[in-house]
A protein has these predicted regions:
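Alpha-helical cap/lid subdomain in secreted, periplasmic
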Residues: 61-203
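Serine-esterase "nucleophile elbow" of acetyl-processing enzymes
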Residues: 1-52, 62-69
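Short acidic active-site motifs
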Residues: 58
Length: 203
């Protein structure tokens, strides 16, 4: 980033990034940009490549189709929930996630400009509890081991939103009206974890 242009942000993901169940200005990506601006950072509107229901394959195809032009000063990656929900084995998910991580790295000037997020725990939501939650939770734990290891191996930054997502078990106000996705209040919790890491990446 230079002083004569605003920071460019690319957010890659699925429903958790696009903000399914909340207004666009209530999703964590929008909140992050606004918080950075409030703290004096010049930030362009984030480029968001994400949709409800997307798997790694869907995201891969969308990146090809939308062809965002880098470099970006900050790239975020949050993907895997739908692979897990569709019962894709961790061994199959791992190379797909690493491929998406490689793509994220390709849009950034260096690995420390990439922020990888863990996959939120959806098994404690009403929808999650109706779909073999123990089996999904076990698979999701392995998925997040893959996510963390990928971030470590590539030297990216990592934000763990799993603890925040688990708070829905005690506070239903953190769940959107669809009984699955995060409510604005949960996006706020994520922001508190994401913001300092993203701000450091832009330093």
């Amino acid at each position: 980033m230079t002083e004569d242009r605003p920071a460019r942000v690319l957010a890659l993901g699925d429903s958790y990034t696009i903000g399914t169940g909340v207004d666009p200005d209530e999703r964590w990506v929008s909140k992050l940009a606004n918080r950075l601006r409030a703290d004096g950072e010049s930030v362009a509107d984030p480029v968001v490549i994400a949709e409800n229901g997307w798997t790694t394959d869907d995201l891969d195809g969308a990146i090809d189709e939308q062809d965002p032009q880098g470099p970006f000063d900050l790239v975020t990656l949050l993907i895997g929930a739908n692979n897990c929900f569709q019962e894709e084995p961790p061994a199959t998910f791992e190379p797909k996630f690493r491929a998406m991580l490689d793509r994220a790295l390709g849009f950034a000037p260096n690995p420390e400009s990439v922020v990888v997020l863990t996959v939120p725990d959806y098994t404690l939501t009403p929808v999650g509890e109706e779909n073999d939650p123990d089996e999904h939770a076990e698979r999701l734990e392995r998925y997040n081991e893959i996510v963390r290891e990928g971030a470590r191996a590539e030297g990216t930054r990592l934000v763990d939103v799993v603890p925040s997502s688990k708070r829905v078990a005690e506070d239903e106000s953190l769940i959107a009206d669809d009984d699955l996705h995060p409510a604005p209040a949960q996006h706020d919790l994520w922001l508190e974890r994401i913001y300092p890491v993203a701000a450091a990446a832009l330093d």
